[in-house]
């Protein structure tokens, strides 16, 4: 049993489209245009499956090759957190269906929590239900037995209140074949409502390297926490790559949760959120230097973050079946 590193070979990428019966309704056209840009970046490399209850929203994507459409009802778009999670076993790929309660009961979630059963039928998936709340954005694997995660999310009483830290660790080790769990106690992104998901803060980009959100502006509200997180990461023994936060961005008076670590690995490429910021190009260049065998593609994510998520949150990878 082994958890995949996200850069391993994939079969397709799931995306769950915004629709009018969701929080995206006030700026639906803007966010669908954002998804159009995202799909355009992915399809030269990998198949995309678009999920939506409203078939009218599929129309703009019909021009793309390498896209499949699935009509299913959803509460929200953030399929990273309610989508099935693949693991590698001696008998091939297996997928876990964890319970989903919308980040500790913050929003409605019954449709999202039910979607894996339907997708498993369509994509003939060996699906194993797991009696535990876990979101894909809260766990980060290096493919070699190491999990990176945060105490603020996984140990939050709004997830698995009945389980102790030791019980959660035991479950995770058994489910994902882990040798080591790295718990980060510091780190947050303003505008994130997941209780500090790891995919907003620190990500493996190689088995031995972690890219992380950094802040050099002492006047920024992130400075102290991200410095403490950086100190924690320096003690892990992994190589580190600092990705500086963009300058503060606001919408409707609210600071947006802009972070460059919310990137997506696909076959042959890395899709990176950008924010019309001077650091966009700097971060894309840093990642290109670190991953010379991959095409690094920026996709504007300023509309995505209005609803507190970005590109990685919006997607879920399905790994190659033999």
Tell what function each PLM region has.
Residues 1-322:
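The feature marks the mature, well-folded catalytic cores of soluble enzymes
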């Amino acid at each position: 049993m082994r958890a995949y590193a996200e850069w391993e070979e994939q079969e397709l990428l799931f995306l769950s489209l915004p629709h009018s019966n969701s929080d995206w309704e006030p700026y639906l056209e803007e966010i669908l245009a954002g998804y159009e840009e995202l799909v355009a970046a992915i399809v030269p490399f990998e198949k995309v499956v678009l999920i939506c209850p409203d078939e009218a929203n599929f129309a703009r994507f019909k021009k793309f090759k390498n896209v499949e459409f699935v009509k299913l009802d959803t509460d929200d778009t953030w399929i990273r957190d309610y989508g099935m999670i693949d693991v590698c076993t001696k008998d091939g790929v297996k997928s876990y269906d964890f319970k989903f309660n919308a980040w500790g009961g913050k929003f409605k979630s019954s449709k999202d929590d039910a979607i894996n059963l339907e997708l498993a039928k369509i994509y003939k998936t060996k699906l194993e239900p797991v009696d535990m709340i876990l979101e894909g954005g809260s766990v980060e694997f290096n493919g070699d037995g190491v999990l990176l995660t945060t105490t603020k999310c996984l140990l939050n009483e709004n997830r698995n209140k009945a389980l102790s830290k030791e019980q959660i660790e035991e479950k995770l080790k058994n489910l994902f074949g882990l040798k080591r769990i790295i718990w980060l106690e510091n780190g947050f992104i303003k505008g994130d409502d997941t209780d500090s998901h790891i995919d907003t803060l620190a990500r493996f980009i190689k088995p031995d390297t972690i890219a992380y959100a950094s802040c050099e502006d002492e006047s920024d509200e992130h400075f102290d926490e991200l410095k403490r997180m950086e100190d924690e990461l320096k003690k892990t023994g992994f190589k580190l790559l600092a990705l500086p936060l963009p300058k503060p961005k606001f919408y409707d008076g609210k600071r947006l949760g802009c972070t460059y670590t919310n990137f997506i690995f696909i076959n042959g490429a890395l899709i990176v959120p950008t924010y019309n910021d001077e650091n966009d190009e700097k971060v894309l260049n840093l990642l290109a230097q670190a991953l010379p065998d991959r095409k690094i593609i920026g996709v504007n994510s300023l509309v995505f973050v209005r609803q507190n998520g970005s590109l990685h949150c919006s997607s879920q990878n399905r790994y190659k079946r033999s």
